């Protein structure tokens, strides 16, 4: 009789063209397909980080209900078209970009001037049409965020500092355009009551469908990890008393932090603090790590993400650590 829950062993990714893919996992215990599929779907739609234009300033325009001489579209339609531009920022969370175009012709996303660490995924996206003598000069602020944030929320918060002509946009940050899931039947040997989960996902190109599913799973792991640390049963999954009364640690805690494959900067900062094993690391709190010289918020987030992918978090408690057999460094 098998008492342990089945874990999916077969993973298949089927590319459907464009930025769409189907990710299939099996087998799951009966009911787990819907349990996990619905959770992944909600995270994919609402919690994935992305980038969007949040503020615009257009030369000669005081508000969005305006028109521009020589431009076919009014300002409202220009802003709607601008929301369709897909941005991807590397190593930064916000940037202000410029777009300057004059003379007859199309204005596309490729006309936006970008630094080396800003990428436009759909450069052929049309923003406006200029007629002879037309001119369009605008500044575009792009920020990183999650979900959908109405412009009224930000506009109310910074009303005293709002400059004339600064237009606040509703921002849809999510890189996931559409996601659905189905649960099919799976079979393992004589068991035919198992689930197969198929996630059908389409993104805007800023992230691949596979990476989106992977990132959403990491978010779920990070959010659920805290339940393993409920007061009175800290690390119940990792600390199991042996028959002799000694403490048995999960093998992952005994591995060196080098196996986490952190950046060189983060790894060196940890070693400078005598953090050599994963068990050493998870007992540190965020505040303690931020006090480490040369370890900033970016490195901290990297460490948290790597730990979350393994079902671990910072601030965990380990009794009887380190084990006597652990190598001293």
From Swiss-Prot:
Top-level lineage group: Bacteria
Alpha C-terminal domain (alpha-CTD): annotated segments: 249-329
GO cellular component: cytoplasm; DNA-directed RNA polymerase complex
Catalytic reaction equation(s): RNA(n) + a ribonucleoside 5'-triphosphate = RNA(n+1) + diphosphate
Transmembrane segments: none
InterPro entries assigned to the protein according to its UniProt record, in alphabetical order: DNA-dir_RNA_pol_insert, DNA-dir_RNA_pol_RpoA/D/Rpb3, DNA-dir_RpoA, RBP11-like, RNAP_asu_C, RNApol_insert_sf
EC category: transferase
GO molecular-function terms, A-Z: DNA binding; DNA-directed RNA polymerase activity; protein dimerization activity
Known EC number: 2.7.7.6
Keywords carried by this UniProt record: DNA-directed RNA polymerase, Nucleotidyltransferase, Transcription, Transferase
Single biological process term from Gene Ontology: DNA-templated transcription
UniProt xrefs under Gene3D superfamilies: 5' to 3' exonuclease, C-terminal subdomain, DNA-directed RNA polymerase, insert domain, RNA polymerase, RBP11-like subunit
Alpha N-terminal domain (alpha-NTD) as annotated region, ranges: 1-231
Any Pfam family matching the protein: RNA_pol_A_CTD
Protein family: Belongs to the RNA polymerase alpha chain family.
Record's comment describing the protein's domains: The N-terminal domain is essential for RNAP assembly and basal transcription, whereas the C-terminal domain is involved in interaction with transcriptional regulators and with upstream promoter elements.
Task of the protein: DNA-dependent RNA polymerase catalyzes the transcription of DNA into RNA using the four ribonucleoside triphosphates as substrates.
Subunit structure: Homodimer. The RNAP catalytic core consists of 2 alpha, 1 beta, 1 beta' and 1 omega subunit. When a sigma factor is associated with the core the holoenzyme is formed, which can initiate transcription.
Name this protein carries in UniProt: DNA-directed RNA polymerase subunit alpha
